[in-house]
Curated annotation (Swiss-Prot):
GO terms for molecular function: ribosomal small subunit binding. This is Ribosome-binding factor A. One of several proteins that assist in the late maturation steps of the functional core of the 30S ribosomal subunit. Associates with free 30S ribosomal subunits (but not with 30S subunits that are part of 70S ribosomes or polysomes). Required for efficient processing of 16S rRNA. May interact with the 5'-terminal helix region of 16S rRNA. Monomer. Binds 30S ribosomal subunits, but not 50S ribosomal subunits or 70S ribosomes. InterPro entries: KH_dom-like_a/b, RbfA, RbfA_dom_sf. PANTHER family: RIBOSOME-BINDING FACTOR A, CHLOROPLASTIC-RELATED. It holds the Pfam family RBFA. It comes from Pelagibacter ubique (strain HTCC1062). Keywords: Cytoplasm, Ribosome biogenesis.
Length: 122
């Protein structure tokens, strides 16, 4: 597995990314970040990718049912400081990474591939 530059992803990046993914999931499930006008208990964190220096975390999220995903991502980006503050209480690191949120398209991509396979099998 390699990141976009072509360098392999280290075990530390994977471990820290998974730790942040689990913590973000708990924060959203318990609504600990207190994001205004957003029900965070319906948000799923599918993956977190870390930068090489562990200072940037890109969290791929998907709201329940996939509806209003653009609005949810926008709200999360606006209130990322609240989420980061809640995350700082869960994770002890020298530098807590900046969190970037992105929509997870992997389920849509998998469904598209599955439909293509079904079409070729007919």
């Amino acid at each position: 597995m390699a990141d976009r530059i072509g360098k392999p992803v280290s075990q530390r990046q994977l471990r820290v990314g998974e730790m942040i993914r689990q913590s973000l999931g708990m924060i959203f499930a318990r609504n600990e970040a207190k994001v205004p006008n957003l029900e965070t208990n319906t948000i799923t964190v599918t993956e977190v990718k870390m930068s090489q220096d562990l200072k940037i975390a890109k969290a791929y999220v998907l709201p329940l049912g996939g509806k209003d995903s653009e609005l949810v991502i926008k709200k999360l980006k606006e209130c990322s400081f609240l989420i980061r503050k809640a995350l700082s209480k869960k994770i002890i690191m020298k530098y807590l990474p900046k969190i970037l949120f992105a929509k997870d398209d992997s389920f849509e991509y998998a469904e598209k591939i599955e439909n293509l396979i079904k079409q070729t099998n007919k």
